[in-house]
Amino acid sequence: MSSGASFIFLFFFLTSFTASVENVFYIKHICPNTTTYSRNSPYLTNLRTLLSSLSAPNASYSTGFQSARAGQAPDRVTGLFLCRGDVSPAVCRNCVAFSINDTLVQCPSERKSVFYYDECMLRYSDQNILSTLAYDGAWIRMNGNISIDQNQMNRFKDFVSSTMNQAAVKAASSPRKFYTVKATWTALQTLYGLVQCTPDLTRQDCFSCLESSIKLMPLYKTGGRTLYSSCNSRYELFAFYNETTVRTQQAPPPLPPSSTPLVTSPSLPGKSWNSNVLVVAIVLTILVAALLLIAGYCFAKRVKNSSDNAPAFDGDDITTESLQLDYRMIRAATNKFSENNKIGQGGFGEVYKGTFSNGTEVAVKRLSKSSGQGDTEFKNEVVVVAKLQHRNLVRLLGFSIGGGERILVYEYMPNKSLDYFLFDPAKQNQLDWTRRYKVIGGIARGILYLHQDSRLTIIHRDLKASNILLDADMNPKLADFGLARIFGMDQTQENTSRIVGTFGYMAPEYAIHGQFSVKSDVYSFGVLVLEIISGKKNNSFYETDGAHDLVTHAWRLWSNGTALDLVDPIIIDNCQKSEVVRCIHICLLCVQEDPAERPILSTIFMMLTSNTVTLPVPLQPGFPVQS
């Protein structure tokens, strides 16, 4: 084949994989040039055959692993792909397609390579790599520069090591060689771990690989991972994998019937027949129960947006098509947007409680028609928000642009919003200090995810008590992303001439100059936590000291050494006063006038969860601008 024809073939070969690729997160690739091939060599032909096999429509995307060989020695090529155990077949396929495209561009002449992505790994070599343990291609990463507090470091390292090694034992014994683990570190911090081997390894080789990878991880940080070409391990203090998927995968099998053995007696008339009937009956019972469980699971996963069903979506499968719901279904669920179903109203529209025909309850937000945003932009933003998967964010289930309206459908929160309890004298007593402190930590976790842990940096811009919803267990979830802005990878600040949000919560630089950043969210967080501590709205202070807002009042009490006078009388006698004062201190750091002096959310979270972190002296606050 001529070089020109070869180039044309390669071009079409590459472009054939790019159509369906979306949202693949590249990590690293390794392709040593110790052995290479020429453009016209048999090895390239075999490599193309191998990659075509791995990316075929019928490849094993549902299991997340496939291996293949092509050609004869010395030009034989062996390869495999391994997708992360919690991703969907669609995401697996996209990642494999992307990696194949990347491989032929980044390693155009190397005879071996390994490509790592967050969602998958692709590997090929001129040596046999199947069912063979390999420690090459190692890559180690820590989660930024955030370290666990020095006094707790050894205990944390032991905790992570023990938890991850337990997961390694489970993974090595499982058919898919994959396992996730979730363990409580503190009242506000949960450890999430994931370990995985290529399924062609033996149990012992898988455990040896994972054990080595865990030893290499920087266990003194708040997160870390090790990637080998045969296995990988990762831990974080946030949920980085799809909990819903792994919960289903790792669910224990149904309990077997009583283990009492059947006793056979000598052949008496009718006895043998009765025993056989009994055995068949038991087996059929077990099979029917198993089939019902499988059918129920499949039904829950495959429910579509039809007039008879509620939406059900998995984070990795989210597309515009999967999110779009039938307007008539939503209208019926809200009883034609009945006033009796209305549960709230804000600047961007009305909120209704909806109940689908299968009993699923949802919150339906009917957006006002004043927005100038086009349908395409609206759909794109909906998909972005829907992909934000965190336990402290309200989950967006779908949308509709039917009937001349724009509608958002969220998961339903039975306990309404934080302000419903916090500012009602009759309900305040349901929020003791323990519960309030838990709410504060949950809000911090949600903002931290938006600012740092999600793939996009997102500024909420409207953090306030009414936008913190509470689930059945009073866990907080951030809601209402109508004003949220997405920042680019290197972007730290943005200006706007359109000041939107809620006065009293807005950082001064935003309210006055239109400048917003992660630090403007930090300011709003500080005001919100002061409200949680005091039980009073930020704009309802008309005290004897002349303060007309909560920040001014808190600053004056702090300066006078009487910070505890800020605390809600309902909780003052049943709280850890040192803990409350520390929270007030953190709030005052958040509302400092100079945005550069305000801590970022990861630092704030460390301050909240570790009493050994020294807090700096707060400087003059930026007093809120009132409407």
Swiss-Prot record:
The active site is at residue 462. The modification Phosphotyrosine is found at residues 410, 510. InterPro entries: GNK2, GNK2_sf, Kinase-like_dom_sf, Prot_kinase_dom, Protein_kinase_ATP_BS, Ser-Thr/Tyr_kinase_cat_dom, Ser/Thr_kinase_AS. CDD domains: Gnk2-like, STKc_IRAK. The keyword rRNA processing does not apply. The chain crosses the membrane at residues 277-297. Residues 337-623 form the Protein kinase domain. ATP binds at residues 343-351, 365. Disulfide bonds: none annotated. Residues 1-20 form the signal peptide. The modification Phosphoserine is found at residue 466. Residues 298-627 are cytoplasmic. It comes from the Eukaryota. Residues 21-276 are extracellular. Gene3D superfamilies: Gnk2 domain, C-X8-C-X2-C motif, Phosphorylase Kinase, domain 1, Transferase(Phosphotransferase) domain 1. Belongs to the protein kinase superfamily. Ser/Thr protein kinase family. CRK subfamily. This is Cysteine-rich receptor-like protein kinase 15. The gene is CRK15.
